[in-house]
Design a protein with these regions (language model features):
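One-carbon transfer enzymes
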Residues: 1-116
Length: 116
């Protein structure tokens, strides 16, 4: 049985998947999403849809600018010792060294073809 799940996602496309996991009792230990961005008009800071639903569901979330060469996030994920990670249109390439940090690997759900 899964005890710790990492969820990584950013757009609206990822929200129903995160909500379904949460509502069905899956143990989401942490959510990764893109950091808030300034909009073009008025320079208002906008959170990603996954960021917003994570706050609503009271889930721990992290918004690193990049995972590449990010020792803090690497150590955090290593210590978390998660069973699996579910990635839904996260918006970052996940470094190989991070892909090795879960017991059962990463599952990627993507709405379009991935870059080669």
């Amino acid at each position: 049985m899964l005890k710790k799940i990492i969820f990584m996602g950013t757009p609206f496309f990822a929200v129903p998947i995160l909500k379904s996991l949460y509502q069905n009792g899956y143990p989401i230990s942490v959510v990764y999403t893109q950091p808030p961005q300034k909009s073009q008009r008025g320079q208002k800071i906008n959170k990603s849809p996954v960021h917003g639903i994570s706050e609503t569901l009271n889930l721990e979330f992290r918004t690193p600018v990049s995972l590449k060469n990010n020792k803090d996030e690497y150590e955090y994920l290593k210590e978390l010792n998660a069973d699996i990670a579910i990635v839904v249109a996260y918006g970052q390439i996940i470094p190989k060294e991070i892909l090795t940090l879960t017991k059962k690997g990463f599952i990627n759900i993507h709405a379009s073809l991935l870059p080669k």
